[in-house]
Amino acid sequence: MEKINHFIELTRIKRPIGYMLLFWPCVWGLTIAYDFSNNIQIFLKYGVLFLCGSILMRSAGCIINDIVDKDFDAKVSRTKTRPIASGKISVKHGLLYSVFLCLIAFLVLIQFNMFTIILAMCSMPLAFSYPYMKRFTYWPQLFLG
């Protein structure tokens, strides 16, 4: 059970601000684009898909960030207890978990149209470059969009 808690901690699911920052722009876009004379269940379906995708991709991104920053995190009091930095979870297991979350997120993504799928796939290099951008700029969040 302790190992499961470390994997939950790795995703930062208990800190919702990260996935909400992904989710709200999606819902705003959906609300602006949606024709509410259609069935509201379709709107709700896409809202739930956006929420699931936001949680999954933010979680995968946190894991990649922890893998890239593990040596730095181990030296900083605020981050030294993170599961990868502290050695509670190996880099290999963290990477496998991140890939697993990305695969589930892809299953969510393919529920959308082809334009959305292509746009999302094109944004992936930007999202996963974030941990590296912290080494070159004071504004790495610009690469997240």
Regions from the PLM with identified roles:
Residues 19, 63, 71-74, 78, ...:
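Hydrophobic positions within alpha-helical membrane elements
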Residues 27, 31-68, 78, 102-106, ...:
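Membrane-embedded alpha-helical segments that form the functional core of polytopic membrane enzymes
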Residues 2, 38-46, 79, 112, ...:
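Membrane-helix interfacial "entry" motifs
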Residues 3-18, 92-94:
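N-terminal membrane topogenic signal
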Residues 8-9, 82-145:
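Intramembrane alpha-helical segments
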Residues 1-7, 62-89:
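Cytosolic, membrane-interface loops and tails of multi-pass inner-membrane proteins
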Residues 13-32, 145:
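The first (N-terminal) embedded transmembrane alpha-helix
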